[in-house]
Amino acid sequence: VTLNGYIAPSIDYFIQTDLCDRGKMKILDAWGRIAVAKGLKFQAGQFRLPFGTDAFRGPGNYVFSNRSFIGKDLCNVRGVGAKLSYTIPLSGYQQLSIEGGAFNPTSISDHEVWIKELSYAAKGIYTIGNVKLVTGVQSISPDSIRVNLWNASCTWATGRWTLEGEYMNKHYTHNAHKTAHGWLLWADYAMPIKAGVFNRASFQ
């Protein structure tokens, strides 16, 4: 269940709840955001850390019926915290967006865990025409070992076609585990249809 809207021209909110996650109700996202200045926004609450491309997609934006290995197992982190985002319009069909923040990676539904180390995440998105380039870093400390990640992706979308490739590197400090590497490559061809409530068929 998703609820979102504006309470003022410069203030919006978003709430997303999973009513049955293995028999339990779980709050996925609950945040508020304010437009501080032109292109500059401040957001606070619980939400996905600003990192990754496929991992950053919400349930309503999944490309496939489930998440990829990168989005499900390699990096799937929500946290309670705050972030700043800034969008810079460039010449022509270009745009640069940067965002970053600090988080407590324990969800608001779990109040018994005390986290001493904050998690951090930042990403940059450069769009030029039909191409979107994304890169970012994330540093989390779920236990006694800090884990550092970085990723890069490229998405091309035009007409009915969308192609995307992403790489993610997950490094454990103090050689606690071997470095993990994740790759994702997919293509989607969308065909418009008229079949009841359905208006699109995808071949992936």
Locate the predicted segments by residue.
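Outer membrane beta-barrel
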Residues: 1-107, 116-118, 124-132, 184-190, ...
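Outer-membrane beta-barrel domain signature
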Residues: 18-21, 69-75, 108-113, 139-145, ...
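Detector for outer-membrane/organellar transmembrane beta-barrel domains
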Residues: 115, 125-204
